[in-house]
């Protein structure tokens, strides 16, 4: 399965004609719905072999999270969430997902209020234990779909203009403990790498506090900044 060339573009998707083959089909739709403005496409393989496809429908500061599911028997995609996290026409969620060993899907995200990167704020969380159909908070409280700014579980409160980067990194270990890496203004009022993690009972934050150089994420478009997004590597 391939999806490519997306930043507010129509869906461009194809798949191989045979398993493991590099001979690809023509471009085709998935469900035919919400496919005119696709950004950040990601495939996730579930432990049972199910394939999920996540993407943003809409634009920076105004978009929703879509999830499709692929049935390998009839080779068809169906939509399981056509608006999981709603920006309500006012904002969008910059999300990252992780599938744990038990097949639970974890999503964390920050909100952005406008195309200005400085409008990023708050780190939020949701988890699904049934393949993406129903979602809940880390407390077990069920979400009403779509999740909105007012209903989202905020696991770390971060105000706008904190140099908060969107699309961070997340990992869930074999015991279900969650680790999220990001950066925003920390100690010394400088952008610092931050860890947000769940102990099994509560969320905690660690400011790594080793950076000495300041910078700003204010404004639109791609930024020339002195750090990269963090990645979590586990073994």
Model-derived regions, located:
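Extracellular, repeat-based ectodomains that mediate carbohydrate processing or recognition
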Residues: 1-235
């Amino acid at each position: 399965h391939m999806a490519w060339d997306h930043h507010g573009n129509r869906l461009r998707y194809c798949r191989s004609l045979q398993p493991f083959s590099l001979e690809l089909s023509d471009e085709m739709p998935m469900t035919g719905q919400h496919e005119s403005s696709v950004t950040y496409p990601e495939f996730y393989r579930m432990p049972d072999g199910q394939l999920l496809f996540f993407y943003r429908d809409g634009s920076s500061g105004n978009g929703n999270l879509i999830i499709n599911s692929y049935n390998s028997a009839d080779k068809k995609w169906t939509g399981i969430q056509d608006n999981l996290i709603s920006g309500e026409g006012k904002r969008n969620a910059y999300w990252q997902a992780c599938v744990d060993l038990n097949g639970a899907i974890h999503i964390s995200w920050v909100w952005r209020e406008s195309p200005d990167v400085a409008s990023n704020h708050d780190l939020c969380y949701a988890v699904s234990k049934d393949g993406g159909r129903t979602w809940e908070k880390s407390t077990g409280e069920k979400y009403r779909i779509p999740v909105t700014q007012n209903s989202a579980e905020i696991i770390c409160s971060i105000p706008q203009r904190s140099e908060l980067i969107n699309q961070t990194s997340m990992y869930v270990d074999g015991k279900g403990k969650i680790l999220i890496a990001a950066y925003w203004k920390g100690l010394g009022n400088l952008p610092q790498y931050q860890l947000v993690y769940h102990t099994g009972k509560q969320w905690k934050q660690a400011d790594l506090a080793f950076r000495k150089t300041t910078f700003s994420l204010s404004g639109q478009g791609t930024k020339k900044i002195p750090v990269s997004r963090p990645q979590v590597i586990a073994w």
